[in-house]
Each structure stands twice: as structure tokens, then as C-alpha cells.
């Protein structure tokens, strides 16, 4: 009688590994492209900046619609909104802190974050 050796299923194949638990590197990440939607709403209300929706869900939908690559003009409207709420030291500090918190929550161990100081020239930080 012969026996058949079954494949070892105890160790997962590389495709079965849960990527969420692996350490990550984030290269060329834009600070003004990673704001939390709720933060955009909070900061816009505090600063009197007009937003295209008044709920987190509505604004998230607007952002997704404009960031889908349909047109550069629509895409850049998102950045016009996010940079509009990054015009004070306090706003910038909150955005940067939350950005790093989100990277950590995603398992990022090294991040290269980019931002455009010239976009903050509305009030000369």
C-alpha cells in the first residue's frame, strides 16, 4: 500500500498572506492628498471655507467622483479644497499629525511625505 504525501497547507503561500499586517513603505505621498474627510469638514467650517457637501458621506462621494481621473480640472478641485483648509499653523499641525497617525495605523514603517509650501501662501505661514 502506498501513501500519498499531501501538500503542507500550514504555511500560507505568498498570495495568502494578509497584507494588512505586513510593514509597509510609503514613497511620494502627498500631505494635501491624504486628509481625513471629517477633518476637511471640521477645518472648513472653522475657517469659513465653502465645501461641496455638508456631511462626511457626501464629501467623500464628491472627492471620489472628482479623483477618478476623468479630468485634471476636476481632480485638482479636490486639492484646492484640501489646501484651503491647510492655511494656518494649527490646521497644518492637525493635518500632519493625523496623516502620520493614519500611516502608523496602516503599518507604514517609513514614509516620504511631500507637500507644497507655496500652496500655503494664502496667509504666509
Predicted stretch roles:
Residues 2-123:
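Metal-cofactor-binding active-site regions of metalloenzymes
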